[in-house]
Amino acid sequence: MKTILLFLLFCGLFSIQQARAQNGPNFQNDTATVNKFITAPLDEVLDEFAATYKIRFIFDRAQMHKYGVSDHYFHDKVKDIIRGICRANDIYYAKQPDGTYFILEKPEDITRLRRLPPGAMKPTVEAKINQAFTEEVITTAAAARPVRTNFALAGRVTDNATGESLPSASIKIRGTNITAVTNTDGYFNLTNVPADTSVLIVSYAGYQTSAERLTPERASQKLVISMLPADNALTEVVINGEKGEAVMNTDTRRVSVVQLTPAKLAVLPNIGERDILRAFQLMPGISGSNESSSGAYVRGGTPDQNLVLFDGFTVYQVDHLYGFYSAFNVNAVKDVQMYKGGFSAKFGGRLSSVTDITGKDGNKKTAGFGVDLSLLSVNIYGETPLNDKSSLLFSLRRSYQGPLYNKIFNKLTNTTTATTGGGGFGGPGGRGGMANFQTQVSSWFYDLNGKYTYTPDDKNIFSLSFYSGKDKMDNSHDLGIPSVLSSSVNSSSITDLTTYGNVGSSAKWSRRWTDKLYANTLVSYSNFFSHRNRGMASSITDSTGTVVDTNSGSAENNNLKDLSAKSDWELNISNTGKILFGGFASRQDVKYDYTQNDTTKLIDQNNQALTLGGYAELEQNFGALRLTPGLRYTHYDLTNKNYIEPRFSASYAINDKLMLKAATGRFYQFTNRVVREDILSGSKDFWVLANGSSIPVGSAIHYILGASYETNKFLFSIEGYYKRLSDLTEYSLRQTGTGGMFNPNSTITLEQNFYNGKGYAKGIEFLVQKKVGQYTGWIGYTLASAFNKFDVYGTDYFPAAQDVRNEFKSINLYQEGRWTFSATWIYASGRPYTAPVGSYTINRAGSGTETYFVVSGKNTERFKAYHRLDAAITYDLIRTSTKKVGSIGFSFFNIYNRSNTWYREYSIQGNQVISTDVNYLGFTPNLTLSLKW
């Protein structure tokens, strides 16, 4: 027993820390001044002060580590800094006659700290510690008593450096389960605040956590909380990571919500661009093995089932360069929220998930400019205040045909143009050879962002946002083939030109009508376009020496226009609840046509639809329990039907660390992107409107259960989900005849087939995240399955094309001074595919023979497992001790050059099916230079 008591005593003493003294009691120097930026846990700040200014501190390290310091000091005295830190965190300090400071969580802690045995402290301070305690214990809590209790508090969270609002910042009242999240303009409302002397803990991804202590006077005014970016923490005291400074944050109170910090993406490995949507692919539940798509495959869904909003308007084309990069410039983005499922009644029109992107408003304090250079593109941006009430932001990114761009472009085009037939599985065609290519490639992409924000007063905000992105892929080339009938050369000029993109804009008015009523009203426009021209102009010498000129080809066009208006309102009805409600209207015009030889329109679709509706949602707190029931109503005029979507989510805080949560809801989708069965014969996909017959309105039901356990340093999260999908659509374009570009004297007939089916997806996601310290990162694992059932393929369910059973992701970041090292490793089990298992030949009278594939069951085969290791090194460029002006980054994609299969090509040789794997990118390095002024 004695041994146990001594051991327990030792453990207790080990957690009680004091700053080290050098010699004698008269070395205290709390009048020294500090002129630098500090961000760190309080215990480490005290250690720094003790070593630098020779001050003795006595405190409980476990207690003090919970409090953070984030401030810029300009020749402030140490004693004033200590007083301010204690005031901000609602803790106590006591100074003894010899200058020793006790830092206390509660006044009574002084007794415990003073009664430590002599061996617990250094001999030089023992005598002083045992002296009578006569000094005053100072704290603002002792001086200020609360005037109001159980009241509602409104405020706004902004960036300290730029004045921009911070959406989706988390606010929590310390010591309670009372929380709030800022809206898109940074405003928040806290209900049932215990007292007007409470302490607010404010956190936001990429920013330093702030502790804001209320006073009766401050609580009665409009509260503005200014936060400091984590990148400012470049001083002698550098601690990477109170909550809110990570690249990714998971909102533990809300169901299936992930928040991204665009400014911190530079530290992650990339293929050539900081990429918002690809960063999300590093989280569990979002597939990370689709290199050819920056779109989100969320929980067994497809990218078109993910609603992507940028400043309120829908973006239909979310990628560049055949899907390798997302279409969003991180320099124009302030905040990104992804809802992986069970999302609010505020959002609709998609079956799987929502990605809500908020653009930057522009610096409201000083002008700033920057440039990013990589092996792929040039990116310039600028922001400036126009006056004290308005600001402007612009950004422009354009690719250039450097080695990285050409590597990706050649990887794609070399595998998508050398085909002689047009048939897919079940149709005629095979792969043929060509000779003497002469290619003049002219390909590029660009995107442009602009935003103007006007704030006439503290009640109104007006903003105009604009986006334009476009890709041009020109793989046209000349082809020469020696004539077998003469000494001349048969020549052909092949056109293969694809352009696609998206233009969008929005005009928004935000108004705080009262402290309890807030509204956002928005009008938006979005235009997706895709054009592809494929043709051949040939000069052929016949047996008589006569030159015959022929022209053939096809053109494919898809255009979607979306004009929308919506108004979202938020009303605080009590200290414990609020109502979200609003209305929306959208007019969509979708065209798709397929033309042969400039004259014959094989497909000509032109549909318009009007969508009207509204929603209402209640957020009600019952202490630790939060319930959020909601309802969304939509009238869709193409079917002339009404669609009701009930939604519900709940969370229960067992304590301040452990949270349980659940969600369910019904979701409808009216605009669909269908994918070709044979991607080599035209566009990979195109958008169409549901018509209620051949293309039904898709629907889904989500069921989600989860739990999270969060400490100061770690987050442990688990979520399980089940989705039931109905009225899914697949598209097949079958070709009969042998006409087309390579057989100009014959005609082809195209048969459209829309197949309808159903499906389900289920899975469980695990996340372990380290948020604090020089080393941060996370490990994610997903066990999932996705199955579909279409009658055309039989009566059984088959694996969906996006079915990936196992995904493991390890993300690691380490910061050492100005250096940041990162490494990511992704493993995914193989995707399913349909494979030819044989072939047969049909003799056609007068037209030769045609060979057809015999295919296996739908998606019964699987590719080999996917895995790759990426790494990056980033060095921050510093102008002064607190000002970051840029960075240099080296990124290495697929370090061990893994051959991961993209898809498989087939040809027929002697009635034998020959397969060839087409792989994703191998080892790819990249260099990035970022500068800002």
Could you tell me what each predicted segment is?
Residues 376-400, 415-475, 500-518, 573-577:
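Transmembrane beta-barrel wall of Gram-negative outer-membrane proteins
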Residues 401-403, 407, 413, 724-727, ...:
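C-terminal beta-signal and adjacent terminal beta-strands/loops
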Residues 529, 637, 657-702, 722-748, ...:
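Surface-exposed extracellular loop regions of Gram-negative outer-membrane beta-barrel proteins
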Residues 558, 562-566, 605-607, 611-615, ...:
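Outer membrane beta-barrel strand-and-loop segments of large Gram-negative receptors
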Residues 46, 89, 98, 105-150, ...:
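Short, acidic, small-residue-rich periplasmic hinge/interaction motif at the N-terminus
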Residues 176-187:
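Short, acidic Ser/Thr/Gly-rich low-complexity loop/linker segments typical of extracellular
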Residues 722-724, 744-837:
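Gram-negative outer-membrane beta-barrel transporters
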Residues 189-192, 267, 313-339:
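Short acidic/polar hinge/loop motifs at secondary-structure boundaries
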